[in-house]
Amino acid sequence: MSRKWPEYLRYLILVILALCAIFPIFFLLINSTKTQLEFSTNPLSLPTGIDWHNYTNAFDIIDRPILNSVIIVVASVFGILAFACMSAYAFTFMNFPFRRVLFVAVFALLLIPGVLTLIPLYLQIKRLDAFGINGNWGGLILPYIAGGQAFSIFVLRTFFGGISKDLVDAARVDGASEWHILGKIVVPLSLPVIVSVAVINIVPIWNDYLLPSLLLAEKYKTLTIALVSLQGNAQTHSSSQFGILMAAYVVACIPLAILFTFLMRYYVQGLTSGALKI
């Protein structure tokens, strides 16, 4: 019996951690359907009924910011994966001068704190106003693509190193171009780790507040900026806006929840296979 106590203790700790993780979601869900009176009376009580007006009001406020966030995330992640796959392929399967030195330089970028680049990045985007990207999606997408390269190249290059070079050489002998080898052989074999890299980049871009607040005009503001603005209104107007705020938080979580639901299998495969390669 005494041997089972450590096992029971582990289960107890896991249950406590699970409850701590679930409680914020539970708090959001129950308060997103409450009326103003119910929320001000007891925020922890269950709602007596379901009030969908909070969701309709919240969506009227954040519909455009959600669209902006989706456009920025999709374009940024597509750019990150496209350039990172090409770079990782070149570092793995192609011979060119200073290949190792360049890869070490790319890896060294991971050691630079992102906050140190904020002022130079801001000034650089402002100087690109002639290209029409200052204040709109392009002014944010380009920094995201550039900032996601170092980590993505490192992970993809590590995985690509486990692919048999004999397979690549055989394709070259058969007359396949480098583009054909990358698109028809390397990318399909690396799909799980590519999905993992995509998810790892999607989450911080979707949740980012600092860069959008610095670089975007009001018309192109993202979901995080809208949520912070709505939170300020809720605090100013007491409890009248908190139900709408909770509903907006729930809506903001839905895209990532759907993403993880459909991509979880590939995400886990990519993490485990990448760990084995490393």
Q: What is each PLM-predicted segment?
A:
Residues 1-4:
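Short, Lys/Arg-rich, polar N-terminal cytosolic tail immediately upstream
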Residues 6-278:
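A structural signal for multi-pass alpha-helical bundles of membrane permease subunits
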